[in-house]
């Protein structure tokens, strides 16, 4: 990747240096071209466009690297090296994780690895009272201000699977997730204010009002971006080969642990 050394110097009226900051910067454009729905009859779209070119994404999710987060940084470079060896060009910072150390983003910048960044919420419906919303606002503001400078950052996503969490409860699949205040109002307004250059996705998978109305309930099968957790017996099972998602941001198989573990 092409990074540049940039120095910002602030002088007082006498020409004396007040403060100075040096950073590595990258120059690029990024947009997310997506539709609100996808069907067999009307296939949708979900594609990242970097410097006016569509990118075929080959990526992975990034989860907590250690049960003790104080040791996370020691694991970052070996895992990034593995991503490079696998020819990954995107890492999705999964919403059940923690906001990663600056070293992670620096390595992604240096190696041209795009970062899809969930805000750190996932898999449930969160409180909506004013006290909780203020805590989310404070946390998100700190995260955006710290991470927004990295050219590897290509997306903020409101959460992991909060939109589809209602689908897992028998009494909640008809609760419209598009009314949820954190992902629909609070976070997008903060991204527009603090990092307007970076696209925002309310949830992953995102159930738009159009997708909700089309299905009449929460159903990610009408969303162009999906998480595919199905049968593990065969990777070419119809569950995978006949799926109409335009972008699969989460999928997995059971892995064999190392003997040492």
Tell where the protein language model's regions lie, with residue ranges.
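Secreted/periplasmic carbohydrate-active enzymes, especially glycoside hydrolases
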Residues: 1-90
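A six-helix transmembrane bundle that forms the core substrate pathway of small-molecule transporters
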Residues: 89, 115-116
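Substrate-binding/catalytic cleft of secreted carbohydrate-active enzymes
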Residues: 93-110, 117-261
